[in-house]
Design a protein with these regions (language model features):
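Soluble or luminal CAZymes and related metallo-dependent hydrolases
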Residues: 48-52, 93, 97, 122
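Solenoid-like repeat scaffolds
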Residues: 79, 110-115, 143-152
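Catalytic core of nucleotide-sugar-dependent glycosyltransferases
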Residues: 72-79, 86-112
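Conserved nucleotide-sugar donor-binding catalytic segment
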Residues: 2-85
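Short leucine-rich amphipathic alpha-helical surface patches
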Residues: 102, 106-109, 127-137
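Short intrinsically disordered, low-complexity coil segments enriched in acidic
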Residues: 1-11, 149, 154-158
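Amphipathic alpha-helical repeat scaffolds of TPR domains
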Residues: 119-129
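Membrane-interface aromatic/basic loop that binds lipid-linked glycans or pyrophosphate carriers
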Residues: 131-169
């Protein structure tokens, strides 16, 4: 999509799909009826104060879809010390919640019927998990026997670690 938005024929979408299925790197404004969030409990991790909102979006994907609108609602400038600019620093400071969030994202994308969307997204998520563990724990992550196939990514995850977490160290 040359205009960095969804095909107009797509009338409903789940928020995580914008990133994982449609590969859009965009900011969104999301309007949610509170009734859909009554049962949602945002997970808390002791000593941590940040968790990606993607957890909530994955929860909402089980409730229904959003109707995408391609219109400008607000204009903004990123703050130099804001969330987006410091995301990898936040990931390091909030390790348990970030791993929880990434693992939930992994489970979400593994349900995709399209093998390309599923594996491309899964690889990026696993590399983020491995890179975060290398950075935060200072060790090469051990993998469970059922995850042995992901060992092939460890070298790439190290490069990912250097590129993504260098500023946060």
């Amino acid at each position: 999509q040359g205009n960095n938005w969804l095909n107009p024929k797509i009338l409903e979408v789940n928020i995580p799909d914008l990133k994982y299925k449609y590969h859009l790197k965009i900011e969104t404004c999301i309007v949610i009826n509170n009734a859909y969030l009554v049962d949602f409990e945002f997970p808390c991790f002791e000593g941590e104060n940040f968790l990606s909102e993607e957890i909530m979006y994955i929860y909402l994907s089980k409730k229904g879809y959003f109707c995408p609108q391609n219109r400008k609602i607000y204009c903004f400038d990123y703050l130099e010390d804001g969330l987006t600019s410091n995301i990898f620093k936040l990931w390091r400071k909030n390790f348990k919640g970030t791993i929880f969030s990434l693992e939930n994202s992994y489970m979400y994308v593994m349900s995709f019927p399209n093998i390309f969307d599923r594996w491309w997204s899964a690889i990026k998520i696993k590399m983020n998990i491995q890179a975060l563990k290398m950075t935060t724990l200072g060790v090469i992550p051990t993998l469970k026997s059922e995850e042995a196939g992901w060992k092939i990514l460890l070298g790439f995850s190290y490069l990912w670690k250097v590129a993504r977490f260098k500023k946060s160290e």
